[in-house]
Regions:
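Short, solvent-exposed positions on alpha-helices
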Residues: 71-74, 138-142
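Substrate-binding/active-site groove segments that recognize
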Residues: 86-110, 121-130, 142, 148-149, ...
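Catalytic and substrate-binding regions of cell-wall glycan-acting enzymes that process beta-1,4-linked
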Residues: 140-186
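Solvent-exposed, acidic/flexible segments
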Residues: 45-56, 65-66, 70, 88-97, ...
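Short polybasic/polar patches that bind polyanions
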Residues: 60, 64, 105, 131
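Cell-wall glycan-active module
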Residues: 1-78, 172-200
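A short, acidic/glycine-rich surface segment
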Residues: 84-87, 154
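Solvent-exposed coil/turn segments that connect beta secondary-structure elements
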Residues: 79-82, 102, 147, 175
Length: 200
């Protein structure tokens, strides 16, 4: 049960907080030793140049502030932009996390080509998607690529080749099917049944 909790909060009893801190400390140390990566998965930061490694370090520092596993954020950036802060898609998706202008505005990104600003906006959006899909990584990744409307309409990963390949690439780097999420952020998608556990 404790592994389903993201962390202690005001409603968490002292004995649960103590146990949670002890159990997650070891888990976090093990994950940190692997660079935030899942064992047996491709490393999205393998072979990065020193300047791109600085971006990866920034992601590792910022992701926990948004309740996002660094490994998932790094996988997204590897697939979205290959760590190019100036990436620009034909659909006008911009920067490291390939934010379209509407999403950038929605998550208060002033300059999508500024690495820190882009990462913060992308993490905020990813955090929202994880809450909306109750921690289901595949659905959150599919929605990051195709939009939550498309995922809801199709009741899962849309039958778009690009999105299906995208989800496969994310899974190659980040294998977890479920991610912790903040259930207070947004009501879950009406297209998927409510699940217990995984939320604060």
């Amino acid at each position: 049960m404790l592994t389903l909790l993201k962390g202690p909060n005001a409603r968490t009893s002292e004995c649960v907080r103590t146990a949670l801190n002890a159990s997650t400390r070891g888990m976090d140390a093990a994950r940190a030793a692997r660079g935030g990566m899942e064992p047996g998965r491709a490393n999205p930061t393998a072979g990065l140049s020193p300047d791109k490694q600085e971006i990866a370090d920034l992601v590792r520092a910022l992701a926990p502030q948004y309740g996002v596993e660094p490994g998932l954020a790094l996988a997204l950036i590897r697939v979205e932009s290959n760590f190019d802060p100036y990436a620009l898609s034909p659909m006008n998706a911009q920067g490291l996390m390939q934010l379209i202008p509407g999403t950038a505005r929605r998550f208060n990104v002033r300059n999508a080509f500024d690495p820190a600003d882009n990462i913060r906006g992308g993490l905020a959006y990813l955090r929202w998607l994880l809450a909306y899909y109750q921690g289901r990584v595949v659905l959150a990744a599919a929605a990051y690529n195709a939009g939550e409307g498309a995922v809801d309409r199709h009741g899962g990963v849309p039958p778009y080749r690009e999105t299906q390949e995208y989800v496969g690439k994310i899974a190659r780097f980040f294998g977890a099917e479920q991610h912790l999420y903040d259930g207070r952020l947004v009501d879950p998608s009406p297209a998927f049944p409510r699940r217990g556990g995984g939320a604060l």
